Amino acid sequence: MKEAGKIFSVLSDEMKTFATLTIRDLTKSFDKQHFANNHISLEIETAKITAFLGHNGAGKSTLLNQMIGFTKPDQGDVCYGDISFVQNRKRARSMMSYMSQQYAPLEKLTVEQNLEMLGRMRGLNTLDLQKEMDQLLTELEIKEYRAKQGKDLSGGLKRLTSFAMALIGSPTIILLDEPTNDVDPIRREKQWQLLQKLAHKGHTIIIVTHNLLEVEKFADNYALFNHGKLIKSGPVQQITYQKQYQISFEFRNKDSLALFQDYTIINGSICQIEIEEKELTRLLPKIKQELDRKNIFNLSLAQKNMSISDLYREELTN
């Protein structure tokens, strides 16, 4: 056990010299017809929280399993610097922690025993282990349950224990699959705050989630998947800083609506449209022309910032 901890420590120190976790042309098919992951390439920033988004079955969990080496890709690689995780799966597991959607705590071990087991595997000495356990249990507000066995915990407490197990020992790369499911709003926020602290210390964090509001509030980057393909990726702020406009007006006949690709008709003759700033700039002269001709009237214009939810709907419903 001491030797395993020593190796983990050495690898963690070595990791600090590398800039990015890189996914290169990663491909996986389980039935030779449908791709779980279809030629995915992505660079994931160090010291950032990256959220993997997409519908159920989009390939997010499969991607995490390939990254840590539980599933072997049909082709492609996952690298950290010059280290290939596909070629050396043991090394990948030494450098990463992984929280799956299933509950991790062993049923007959207490919360504390589960954490202690993982902490010792990751090389923590007794003093540091106790300190980290106390800190995690306190910050997640589950200290009072430390002596409870896994089988006696509620779903939310099992999820929080699994989360703490992924964080104990501060692995350099942390993979989390829907870690806030079943967790109450107060503790969910504390989970994200812990992840932000780790990211600020230089850790690479990847989280699969369907909670888009939390992504906007806490994540640095996003990657959006659909049917096994990477659709779009980038900084969250790049999306939320984009201006979007909501236009409402009444129309005399539907011919005026030919200007717009997408619109919603409310109460018969009232139309509502949401468009981005560049599209509004293009359409303004034509809208003015329709106003002058009195084909449309009672025009109102409201500005708002685009959200991750807007991006999600736009990319996955077209």
Model-identified regions with their sequence ranges:
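Conserved ABC transporter NBD signature motif
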Residues: 76-87, 91-92
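Conserved ABC ATPase "signature" region
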Residues: 116, 120, 127-145
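ABC transporter nucleotide-binding domain
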Residues: 194-274
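Catalytic Walker B motif of ABC-type/P-loop ATPase nucleotide-binding domains
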Residues: 174-178
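Short, charged/small-residue-rich alpha-helical element at the C-terminal edge
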Residues: 245-315
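A short, flexible loop at the N-terminus of ABC-type nucleotide-binding domains that lies
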Residues: 3-23, 27-39, 89
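Helix-to-loop junction immediately C-terminal to a conserved catalytic motif
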Residues: 68
